[in-house]
Amino acid sequence: MRILAILLMASVCGISCSHSTDDFQPEAIVALERGALDRWGKGDPQGFFDIMASEQTYFDPTTAKRIDGQDALKKYIAPFAGKIRIEKVEMIDPKVQRSGDLAVLTFNLVDYGAQMDGGPKTTARWNSTEVYQRLNGSWKIVHSHWSYTKPVLKE
């Protein structure tokens, strides 16, 4: 009887332990991004740096080329730190697609009342792709790509 109980407990532990190692929740990735966006809207870029891998790559409409690594990205972002204010951030239709230790988050973003250094308030509309990788048990951004939604193109 004792052997049967031990085997039963070992089986239950094996099943529950194997289940918990791959307990992926897409909303956890979305929550990481929302938290970073909320801090960014208060002028604090550290929310993004906290969830980025050290070797992250980055594009946005104002970069001349890809930015490689968090140190280079911090230098690029430094002039904006503390100067950006956004009244309301709306993340539209976030979608997380995952394969193994990689997850891709895509969404549209609307920044209402976006203001740079006390200048005029605007509404900014973005497309975003964030590639997350599970590193040492935590999801980190390894690549960011931001573009304007329906940008005005010169002929």
Task: Write out the residue ranges for each language-model feature.
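Bacterial N-terminal signal peptides
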Residues: 5-14
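A beta-strand edge to alpha-helix "cap/lid" segment located at domain peripheries
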Residues: 17-50, 57-155
